[in-house]
A protein has these predicted regions:
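N-terminal export/assembly segments and adjacent metallocofactor-ligating motifs
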Residues: 1-234
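Internal, active-site/partner-interface "lid" segment
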Residues: 233-245
C-alpha cells in the first residue's frame, strides 16, 4: 500500500502546531512538522514529534505504565498500579511525614474526577493539593484583564520576529516554549533580549542582559519602573486616557 500523508494538528497545547502523519497500512510510520504552516513552519517541540508513540509504542495504551529496572516504561495491570501507587505514597509519608506528598490537578480532568482526586488526597491521604491553574492560565487571565482589559495577550508570534527589544520576565522559552523561541531566532533585526529572572536559565544565558532579581521581587521591580516612567513623563497619556480605566 502506498504511503499516505494525513495533515492534522498537535493536541498537546493551544499553539496547535500543524503535523504531517505519514501512514502506511493504517499505521503511523513517521511524524513530520508541516512546512509553510504559519504557526510552526516545519518545526515543533519534542512532544509533538512523539505524537505517534501513544499509538505505536505500546500494544494497549489503556493500561498504566511503570518504569522498569532497565529504565524503560512497562505496562502493568490496574490492580498492580493501585498497589504500587498506594505503597509508594504510604512509604514516603511514613518516612517524611504526611505533608511530604502533594497532588496537583490538571485541566484534562472532568469535574467528577477532580472531586474524587481532592476527596482521596485530602481526606484519606492528608495531602496538600493545588490546581494546575496556578501554574497555567488562571493567573495570566487576571493579569491580562487588569493590564489590557481582555483575557488574552494582545500580540502574535509575528511580533517576536519584528520587535527590536524583547523582555522575558520569569520565562524560559528556550526550554519551555521552543515554538516561541524559534520566532525570536527568526528575528532579522538582531533584537536586544533582556531576561528578568532569579535563575540563570537557558534563556538568560542567551540574553544580552540578565537581571537576576531576588525571588518574589518582580512586582517591586515593575512598580519601580512604572513609577520612574511617570516621574520622567515618558508615558503616552493620550493612549492611557483612551484605552485604560
Amino acid at each position: 500500500m502506498d504511503m499516505k500523508k494525513v495533515q492534522s494538528t498537535c493536541n498537546y497545547c493551544s499553539i496547535a502546531c500543524n503535523i504531517d502523519f505519514n501512514v502506511e497500512d493504517n499505521e503511523i510510520v513517521s511524524v513530520v512538522p508541516t512546512q509553510g504552516y504559519p504557526v510552526n513552519n516545519g518545526f515543533c517541540c519534542i512532544k509533538g514529534l512523539n505524537l505517534d508513540k501513544q499509538n505505536t509504542k505500546f500494544p494497549n495504551p489503556v493500561y498504566p505504565l511503570v518504569r522498569g529496572k532497565d529504565g524503560e516504561m512497562e505496562q502493568i495491570s490496574w490492580d498492580e498500579a493501585f498497589k504500587v501507587m498506594a505503597s509508594k505514597i504510604k512509604e514516603l509519608q511514613d518516612k517524611y511525614g504526611r505533608e511530604s506528598v502533594a497532588f496537583i490537578s490538571t485541566g484534562q480532568l472532568t469535574t467528577e474526577e477532580m472531586a474524587l482526586l481532592g476527596h482521596i488526597g485530602r481526606n484519606y491521604l492528608g495531602m496538600n493539593g493545588d490546581g494546575n491553574t496556578r501554574l497555567c492560565m488562571a493567573t495570566s487571565v487576571v493579569a491580562h484583564k487588569q493590564s489590557y482589559g481582555f483575557d488574552a495577550p494582545p500580540y502574535t508570534f509575528d511580533d517576536l520576529e519584528l520587535s527590536d527589544t524583547l523582555i522575558f520576565i520569569g520565562a524560559n522559552p528556550v526550554v519551555a516554549h521552543p515554538i516561541l523561541w524559534t520566532r525570536v531566532r527568526n528575528n532579522k533585526n538582531n533584537p536586544k533580549i533582556i531576561v528578568i529572572d532569579p535563575r540563570q536559565s537557558e534563556t538568560a544565558i542567551r540574553a544580552d542582559e540578565w537581571v537576576d532579581i531576588k525571588p518574589k521581587a518582580d512586582l517591586r521591580l515593575l512598580y519601580t519602573l512604572a513609577n520612574y516612567l511617570i516621574e520622567k513623563d515618558w508615558i503616552d497619556k493620550d493612549y492611557i486616557e483612551k484605552y485604560t480605566e
